[in-house]
């Protein structure tokens, strides 16, 4: 409910860039020194960077060739950009990808853990458990090799689930990834379709295709923008 309390603040934040521009213009017109105005503008820009979060998803290395539209062209490797805008009641996520093999279908999840390190290489400490996972959307690669998705839900900092019946405390899922919907789509890269993963509506999906990377210091995913490093491991502090 803390987002509702922020609603009036968000309205003022959206209005502030206009008066900042007016203040700068007035300072210059009157021959004044706009240092204070510039400092205010820089502060506003810094705050806006907290309201809009951008990050990339990276291919799961073992299955990149089965994912790629141009598997032999390193200059046209699969790429996906994610933009999340913080809202007063919920957040909006926009996903845009290209150079994906046309016709492939995927399933988008928010997950607790990623199998990649901060440099997008496979994390040697990963043991196959993505932790808490929530199904968010389907993805379809177009004839041009593009994928798009848009969702609205709680994503930044306050994204969590819990279940007291199994003693699961509130647990965040701050990574974003998507899985091959069809297990057979990744056979050419060594996936055994007789051992599907649960990452689609039928719980018979293929392997992970692309996923976000964690922060190098906190090891939290990009959906956490306020990390509390006073604890070990670090946790997200809304």
Q: Where are the regions a protein language model picked out?
A:
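N-terminal leader/targeting pre-sequences
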Residues: 40-238
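N-terminal secretory signal peptides that target proteins for export/translocation
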Residues: 1-15
């Amino acid at each position: 409910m803390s987002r509702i309390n922020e609603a009036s603040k968000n309205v003022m934040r959206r209005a502030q860039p206009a008066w900042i521009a007016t203040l700068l213009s007035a300072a210059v017109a009157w021959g004044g020194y706009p240092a204070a105005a510039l400092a205010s503008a820089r502060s506003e820009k810094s705050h806006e960077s907290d309201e809009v979060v951008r990050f990339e998803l990276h291919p799961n290395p073992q299955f990149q060739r089965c994912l790629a539209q141009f598997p032999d062209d390193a200059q046209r490797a699969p790429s996906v950009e994610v933009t999340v805008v913080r809202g007063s009641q919920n957040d909006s996520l926009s996903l845009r990808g290209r150079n994906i093999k046309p016709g492939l279908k995927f399933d988008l999840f928010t997950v607790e853990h990623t199998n990649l390190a901060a440099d997008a290489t496979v994390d040697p400490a990963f043991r196959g458990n993505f932790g808490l996972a929530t199904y968010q959307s389907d993805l379809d690669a177009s004839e041009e090799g593009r994928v798009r998705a848009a969702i609205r839900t709680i994503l930044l900092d306050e994204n969590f689930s819990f279940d007291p019946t199994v003693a699961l405390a509130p647990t965040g899922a701050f990574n974003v990834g998507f899985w091959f919907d069809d297990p057979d789509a990744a056979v050419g890269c060594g996936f055994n379709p007789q051992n599907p993963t649960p990452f689609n509506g039928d719980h018979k999906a293929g392997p992970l295709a692309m996923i976000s990377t964690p922060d190098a210091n906190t090891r939290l995913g990009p959906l956490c923008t306020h990390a509390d490093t006073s604890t070990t491991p670090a946790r997200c502090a809304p």
